[in-house]
Amino acid sequence: SAILGINDQVSTIDGAFDFMRKSFNPYYSSHPVSYDLKEADEVVFFGHSLGDNDYHYFQPFFRRQCEEDLELKEKRTITIFTYNENSRMEIMRTLHKMNGGKTSLLFQNNELNIFCTGDSRLEESPSFRKWYSDRITEIQRVRTQQFFDDIAKY
């Protein structure tokens, strides 16, 4: 189920519209996405604008990935699928805002891919072909007995 509403940081005109706050809804429960992002080796956004409504979920993650002292073990593969060049530029503006203007460090510290699904040449792109090939390799790896044996060790 989806709960639509406004974020806690937005003024509700002296509380008159507090009922519209997501967190005030009795059916609202949030998933601690920040922990998942911190632990993930790879993060994929598909069709997500990273806009203002969800900004607070992702800003700490993107800020951390732009730190100058980021250790190699904290490097992430971050892949964003969007529709076209206009939406890609909107996402770039949002990322620039989220990370205090350190967008170049986001590329430097991580494997950052932004793919436009509306681009008819997407499948020809070397970076997309590499990303896709890596996903196929990972799918094959998790289908092996060794993968399950390794999980059982923990």
Question: Whereabouts are the PLM-identified features?
Answer:
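Extended, H/D-rich, highly charged conserved domains that either
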Residues: 1-25, 39
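Active-site-adjacent structural elements in folded domains
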Residues: 25-31
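SIR2/sirtuin-family catalytic core signature
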Residues: 31-154
